[in-house]
Curated annotation (Swiss-Prot):
The lineage of its organism: Eukaryota, Viridiplantae, Streptophyta, Embryophyta, Tracheophyta. Pathway: Secondary metabolite biosynthesis. This is Xanthohumol 4-O-methyltransferase. S-adenosyl-L-methionine binds at D227. Its main location: cytoplasm. Highly expressed in lupulin glands. Detected in cones, male flowers and roots. It comes from Humulus lupulus. InterPro entries: COMT-like (IPR016461), O_MeTrfase_dom (IPR001077), Plant_O-MeTrfase_dimerisation (IPR012967), SAM-dependent_MTases_sf (IPR029063), WH-like_DNA-bd_sf (IPR036388), WH_DNA-bd_sf (IPR036390). It is an enzyme of class 2 (transferase). Belongs to the class I-like SAM-binding methyltransferase superfamily. Cation-independent O-methyltransferase family. Optimum pH is 8.5. Disulfide bonds: none annotated. Optimum temperature is 39 degrees Celsius. It is found in: Cytoplasm. Homodimer.
Length: 360
């Protein structure tokens, strides 16, 4: 009897602890934002060995009256979240902070060809334009729609970029950072996915970073970067590799043997995805064509490395877009309605998966 009572007490305490952790979950994200604004990852990684709090403080830019106690509290949570490692000095008197694999992904700039950073994506997701829509989740459930449009007068996320250079840069840099990490994972694990393709159009390809990397790795491919006119207008030139085409994927898609879409369809409702997929089908030949979709395949009951992040990102899409993350069953339905009844899912070492779909 006593044992059962103790078990119930333990369960109740765990439940309470879980609620407290969720209540304060915003601290994780905002402390990460704080660390990037203070350039803490850059500072720690610029040293060859773990460094003291005072060394970090002395290197924070534009901070003549930095509060060392506050900085210590910020570092305490970052260590607890394993963003940084913590050590003792040789005399045991001081705490030292060192880099981790996580902090490497938060550097402001990459210097090596195989190096990636998600710092721009953190800056994007914590931008004030994206913060307010989260308070509208209950209204989203009651009324449908998404929080971003509710807060911003019916304008979608991408509607704010053309007339706002500051947000446009934050948006583009954020998308480019996720594109790079995903494209590198694909090229390292599934190079064969691009074999036998003579032409490839990257729909929603932003500035062309992904398609240029693919063509460099597979020189036989004619690469087309396709995005809205105001996006490709400022895209860099990839001489001999990629041509830029401006347009609207809901209206038409440039002709190619294969279509590549990375983190695009999850931004849209099912009926919108079907329209896009049908346009993709029209853009490719009757035989030999395929679509390569790079997106999350949800496993709600899964315990994989990225499953928790995937479910959380699905809620972000509810707040910010008209889209959602999809299970395999949901992907199958959308693909079939869009004209792609055959598909296979390839796992890659990333948050996303590769879905190869065929019109026959």
């Amino acid at each position: 009897m006593e044992l059962a009572r103790n078990d119930q007490t333990e369960a109740a305490l765990r439940g309470e602890a879980n609620v407290w952790k969720s209540i304060n979950g915003i601290a994780d994200f905002m402390v990460m934002k704080c660390a990037l604004e203070l350039r803490i990852p850059d500072i720690v990684h610029s040293h060859s060995a773990p460094i003291t709090l005072a060394q970090i403080a002395s290197s924070v830019p534009d901070s003549p009256s930095l509060n060392l106690s506050y900085l210590s509290r910020i570092m305490r949570l970052l260590v607890r979240r394993k963003i940084f490692s913590q050590h003792k000095s040789l005399d045991g008197e001081e705490v030292l902070y060192g880099p981790t694999h996580s902090s490497r992904l938060l550097l402001s700039k990459t210097t090596l060809p195989d190096q990636v950073t998600l710092a721009p994506f953190v800056a994007f997701m914590t931008h004030p334009y994206l913060s307010a829509p989260w308070s509208c989740l209950a209204r989203c459930v009651k009324e449908g729609g998404n929080g971003f449009e509710m807060v911003h007068g019916g304008r979608q996320l991408w509607d704010l970029s053309p007339g706002n250079p500051e947000f446009n840069k934050v948006f583009n840099d954020g998308m480019a950072s996720t594109a790079r990490i995903t494209t590198m994972a694909i090229l390292s694990e599934y190079r064969d996915v691009f074999c036998g393709i003579c032409s490839l159009v990257d729909v929603g390809g932003e500035f062309g970073g992904s398609i240029s990397a693919i063509v460099k790795s597979h020189p036989h491919i004619k690469g087309i970067n396709y995005d809205l006119p105001h996006v490709v207008a400022t895209a860099p030139t990839y001489t001999g590799l990629v041509s830029h085409v401006g347009g609207n994927m809901f209206e038409w898609i440039p002709t190619a043997v294969a279509v590549f879409m990375k983190w695009i369809l999850h931004d849209w409702a099912d009926e919108d995805c079907v329209k896009i997929l049908k346009n993709c089908r029209r853009a490719m030949p009757e035989k030999g064509g395929k679509i390569i979709i790079v997106d999350i395949v949800l496993e709600p009951e899964g315990n994989g490395l990225f499953d928790d992040a995937a479910v959380m990102l699905d809620i972000a899409l509810m707040a910010l877009t008209r889209g959602k993350e999809r299970t395999e069953k949901e992907w199958k339905r959308v693909l079939e309605e869009g004209g792609f009844p055959r598909y296979q899912i390839l796992k890659i070492p990333a948050l996303t998966s590769v879905i190869e779909a065929y019109p026959q």
